[in-house]
């Protein structure tokens, strides 16, 4: 599933080609996503100029002169730029054609993504309850410490809770906990303020590094320019269950936490 760095990589790839451009038409080949694509999307968006492309958590906000297209890539979706008229392959559900001769093409084999329309996107039901962005000053270790008091859940699903902080998905939660030396199974309430301060620093560092390297390529993800991400080359623990720790050589253990695979080093993390 594309996580925050992959979505931000997509935003950076498509924004320069969309902002300031006028939409000539919208072609919808299949409306059946997680929520149906609005039947009047072509009418709403065609003829409008795209003003700004933003990201909130893992949602892309394509702001037109009137209204905003909210897009989520789901489990396996991607947005990329193609030439207008390029024949569509299977699973290529939407083309947003621009007067520049380019089209923004949405592909989603599993159809778990979304394309919705809103006149007030930040107050849309999908976005209004989201926590702070991890790379802003609104998120820090003190927030983690305060929100964790009384929480008996494991620390990994705690930091993956979008009400606590957005965008810390399975890959980056696994890596950040390793970098901070915290066992993912530990109760959130049992972790000290000092360790949460360290964890927040590592979350910010790892997400920023992943964005710089274009995200992590796992199966389906490619950036908005059609290129893969390269952060996978720097993963210390994610996806390496049974292999040896790159730091101490101990065998990495893989467990299930909150229905997700989690890998950790029993020596480096406590």
Swiss-Prot record:
Gene3D superfamilies: 1.10.8.50, MutM-like, N-terminal
Keywords noted in UniProt: DNA damage, DNA repair, DNA-binding, Glycosidase, Hydrolase, Lyase, Metal-binding, Multifunctional enzyme, Zinc, Zinc-finger
Name of the gene encoding the protein in the UniProt record: mutM
One Pfam family per UniProt: H2TH
Top-rank taxon, per record: Bacteria
Start-end of FPG-type zinc fingers: 236-270
Record's catalysed reaction(s): Hydrolysis of DNA containing ring-opened 7-methylguanine residues, releasing 2,6-diamino-4-hydroxy-5-(N-methyl)formamidopyrimidine; 2'-deoxyribonucleotide-(2'-deoxyribose 5'-phosphate)-2'-deoxyribonucleotide-DNA = a 3'-end 2'-deoxyribonucleotide-(2,3-dehydro-2,3-deoxyribose 5'-phosphate)-DNA + a 5'-end 5'-phospho-2'-deoxyribonucleoside-DNA + H(+)
UniProt cross-references to InterPro entries, sorted A to Z: DNA_glyclase/AP_lyase_DNA-bd (IPR015886), DNA_glyclase_Znf_dom_DNA_BS (IPR015887), Formamido-pyr_DNA_Glyclase (IPR020629), FPG_cat (IPR012319), MutM-like_N-ter (IPR035937), Ribosomal_uS13-like_H2TH (IPR010979), Znf_DNA_glyclase/AP_lyase (IPR000214), Znf_FPG/IleRS (IPR010663)
Cofactor: Zn(2+)
Textual note on the cofactor: Binds 1 zinc ion per subunit.
Protein name (record): Formamidopyrimidine-DNA glycosylase
Active site residues of this protein: 2 (schiff-base intermediate with dna), 3 (proton donor), 58 (proton donor), 260 (proton donor)
Function, as annotated: Involved in base excision repair of DNA damaged by oxidation or by mutagenic agents. Acts as a DNA glycosylase that recognizes and removes damaged bases. Has a preference for oxidized purines, such as 7,8-dihydro-8-oxoguanine (8-oxoG). Has AP (apurinic/apyrimidinic) lyase activity and introduces nicks in the DNA strand. Cleaves the DNA backbone by beta-delta elimination to generate a single-strand break at the site of the removed base with both 3'- and 5'-phosphates.
Family that this chain belongs to: Belongs to the FPG family.
Organism (species): Pseudomonas fluorescens (strain ATCC BAA-477 / NRRL B-23932 / Pf-5)
EC number: 3.2.2.23, 4.2.99.18
Oligomeric and partner information: Monomer.
GO molecular function: 8-oxo-7,8-dihydroguanine DNA N-glycosylase activity; class I DNA-(apurinic or apyrimidinic site) endonuclease activity; damaged DNA binding; zinc ion binding
GO BP annotations, alphabetical order: base-excision repair
UniProt-annotated binding residues for DNA: 91, 110, 151
């Amino acid at each position: 599933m594309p996580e925050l760095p992959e979505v931000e990589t997509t935003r950076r790839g498509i924004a320069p080609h969309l902002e300031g451009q006028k939409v000539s038409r919208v072609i919808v080949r299949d409306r059946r996503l997680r929520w149906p694509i609005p039947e009047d999307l072509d009418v709403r968006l065609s003829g409008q100029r795209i003003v700004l492309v933003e990201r909130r958590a893992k949602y892309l906000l394509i702001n037109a002169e009137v209204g905003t297209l909210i897009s989520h890539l789901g489990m396996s979706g991607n947005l990329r730029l193609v030439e207008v008229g390029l024949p569509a392959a299977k699973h290529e559900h939407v083309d947003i054609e621009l007067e520049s001769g380019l089209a923004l093409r949405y592909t989603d084999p599993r159809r778990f993504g979304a394309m919705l329309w809103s006149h007030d996107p930040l107050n849309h039901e999908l976005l209004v309850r989201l926590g702070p962005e991890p790379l802003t000053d609104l998120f820090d270790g003190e927030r983690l410490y305060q929100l964790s008091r009384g929480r008996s859940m494991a620390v990994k699903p705690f930091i993956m809770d979008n009400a606590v902080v957005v965008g810390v998905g399975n890959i980056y939660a696994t890596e950040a906990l390793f970098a901070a030396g915290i066992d993912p199974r530990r109760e959130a309430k049992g972790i000290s303020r000092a360790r949460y301060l360290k964890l927040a620093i590592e979350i910010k560092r790892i997400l920023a590094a992943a964005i710089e390297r274009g995200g992590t390529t796992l199966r389906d993800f490619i950036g908005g320019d059609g290129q893969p991400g390269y952060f996978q080359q720097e993963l210390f623990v994610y996806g390496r269950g049974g292999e040896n720790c790159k730091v101490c050589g101990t065998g990495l253990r893989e467990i299930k936490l909150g229905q997700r695979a989690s890998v950790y080093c029993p020596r480096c993390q406590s």
